[in-house]
Amino acid sequence: MSLGCRERAQAVQGEAELKDMVRRMMPVVAQATGLQFKREPLVLRRSRAQVRDYVIHKFDEDLPPGDLAGLQSALRLFGLIPDSLELRPTMIDLLTEQIAGYYDPDSNALFIPADIDQFQLRMVVSHELVHALQDQYVRLDSIITQRHANDRRAAAQAILEGQATVAQISVLMPEQKPETLPLGLFWRQRAAMAAQQAQMKEFAHAPLWIREGLVFPYLGGADFIIWFRRTYLGRSVLDSMPRSTEQILHPERYRDHDEPTDLSVASGEPDTVRWEDNLGEFETRLLFQQLLGNEPEAATLATGWDGDRYQVLGAQSDVLVWYSVWDDAAAATRFTAGLQRAWAKRRSDSRTAQRSEIKLLTIQGRSVVRLVDAPNDWKGWRALPTVRLSGGAE
């Protein structure tokens, strides 16, 4: 048999074994999630080059050039990534390095890299099978591609990845009952996970916002799922998913139906809106952690978040206007003082032509904080954008 034929035969045999593994694992995954498969997903091998091509395709599909430029400007203005960092190549290299398998909703297929080792294979297949099952009950594409809804999307990703993380424990370690695990266990494993990830070059050199954003859905999401399974026996979390990372971080807010307040920003002086979105409680934590370097303090300062909205404005994308609303005056006052300290550090070595203003306001009877960071000669200083609140604890 020629070398090419032999390699092809081995590939066919490998895919047959993979399909057999999927069929044997499907009932166990169904039992672990409480959901039944409506159809069997496809499963295919892919080379590492094909994995990279997929990452590029999905990244460009999710963030077309205009959106990418807007988001990158926002992250630079907040100080969450360095001005020198180019988001697209950084994320593509990092995701290519990280991905050990993926489920593609468009083709209803699990794709497994050809170079994956046998130790990882069962773990990856069990995890991605959960995503295939989730896609049969909710539209994954519509959830993970919500535009200008960063925090809600992050909360949804935490549910999807958290459920898959918990379910794979039941698949790989049947003797371990997830409901018996201590609450908060997964998030406390971050240090150990970070040590493992530090061996991966792209992850180790990525900014805090990227590193923590990749880890949060798995660990923070898994902790929420453990809580949910204890609190709502027999119910599916997919039927009523959290709407904010606040509800992931503080599950009692989910239980109490504490929904985030929606903010609508209206322009003052005519200007070009380059990007608009929100941070949410989790990324507000990351902002403080990045600027102040103290994780416990960052968590305290972000607690009490009830909603936020920011805009990137100006022809040069050099204006940031950020409104946030808080549960009460105490939380807003604490946040304001923390943001003033953090922003002073942020701008300590900045251009003198940039002006920053942080104010605690009362709008519609609620405690609201406004940050404006813009060039001194920005025309919008004469009539700043305003905000309207709706929903939440109005």
Model-derived segments and their meaning:
Residues 6-8:
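Bacterial signal peptide processing site
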Residues 20-119:
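Auxiliary, metal-adjacent structural segments of Zn-dependent hydrolase domains
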Residues 25, 135-141, 145-194:
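Post-HExxH zinc-binding segment in Zn-dependent metallohydrolases
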Residues 29, 123-140, 164-165, 328:
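Active-site recognition of the HExxH zinc-binding catalytic motif
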Residues 38-58, 147-151, 182-191, 242-246:
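Acidic helix-start/capping segments at beta-turn-to-alpha-helix junctions
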Residues 109-126, 149-156:
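Short pre-active-site segment immediately N-terminal to the catalytic Zn-binding motif
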Residues 198-317, 323:
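Pan-zinc metallopeptidase signature
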Residues 306-394:
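C-terminal soluble interaction/assembly domains
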